[in-house]
Amino acid sequence: MGAQLRVYTQKIKSAQTTKKITRAMELISASRIQKAQQRMAASAPYSRAVTRAVSAVATFSNVDHILTTEPEKVERAAIVIFASDRGLAGAFSSSVLKESEQLAELLRSQGKDIVYYLVGRKAVGYFKFRKRSSERIWTGSTEKPEFETAKSIGDALVEKFVTPASEGGVDEIHIVFNRFVSIATQKPEVVRLLPLEVVEGVEAPGEGAVLPLYEFEPEVGDVLDALLPVYIESRIFNAMLQSAASEHAARQKAMKSASDNADKLVTTYTRLRNNARQTEITQQISEIVGGADALASSK
């Protein structure tokens, strides 16, 4: 019985130690969520300004540009998956990977070949475990995204997009990431990045209003050449910031759940230890009483 008490005591100590770790990680994630939200808010004006500029050029010009023109036939499509570098974040990475699998299945049903670009070690590990290939990978920047990484991803995607599919290029590009809705809610989202789908269009003039006259210097094509890579980089960087905030929120939620479970384990093992101690004491009392009765009857 004493051995059983020691086992329960050891389990209680182990659960308490685990709770200290998960509680610390929960607090760290809570702090990082605030910083991630601040970075999202700080980048929003720039992203909106770039989007409005691209919207104006795309709306008020009739130029055919490779980044805004729908291809006659889509043969190859790229999927960029934004996962995490670390685990202990609940279903954060698994949800975005599941969403990407559903997207890939849809694209294949349309007769398109798939090329993968992976961001985050969890996505890389997922593909390696299944012995599946990817075009390029980026790791080490999911928790604190850097614009240089977004630019690297954007340059690689634009280069692949302007290359004909017959020469190894792609006809369209999709990104899959977790959008940060709130601390309690993060949703996997799919966005078609190229050909360009302007998210924030230019408002149409009211009845009787005169359409503004836009003059582009130099040519419209040159303006698009300069604006669209910047737009792609800003969209990718926004996806990285959204994903980072979602990762910290998911990790905070997972660590809080782990801390709560540790509390429940401590309560359960404490009750079991008390029951074992009570049983041991009762057994000892019974042995003492039985011994006393035996001595009394032997006289």
Curated annotation (Swiss-Prot):
Its main location: membrane. The keyword Nucleotide-binding does not apply. One of its GO terms (molecular function) is ATP binding. Keywords: ATP synthesis, Cell membrane, CF(1), Hydrogen ion transport, Ion transport, Membrane, Transport. GO terms for cellular component: plasma membrane; proton-transporting ATP synthase complex. The keyword Membrane applies. GO terms for biological process: proton motive force-driven plasma membrane ATP synthesis. InterPro entries: ATP_synth_F1_ATPase_gsu, ATP_synth_F1_gsu. It is found in: Cell membrane. It is a peripheral membrane protein. F-type ATPases have 2 components, CF(1) - the catalytic core - and CF(0) - the membrane proton channel. CF(1) has five subunits: alpha(3), beta(3), gamma(1), delta(1), epsilon(1). CF(0) has three main subunits: a, b and c. HAMAP family: ATP_synth_gamma_bact (MF_00815). NCBIfam families: ATPsyn_F1gamma, PRK05621.1-2. Produces ATP from ADP in the presence of a proton gradient across the membrane. The gamma chain is believed to be important in regulating ATPase activity and the flow of protons through the CF(0) complex. Belongs to the ATPase gamma chain family. This is ATP synthase gamma chain. It comes from Clavibacter michiganensis subsp. michiganensis (strain NCPPB 382). The gene is atpG.
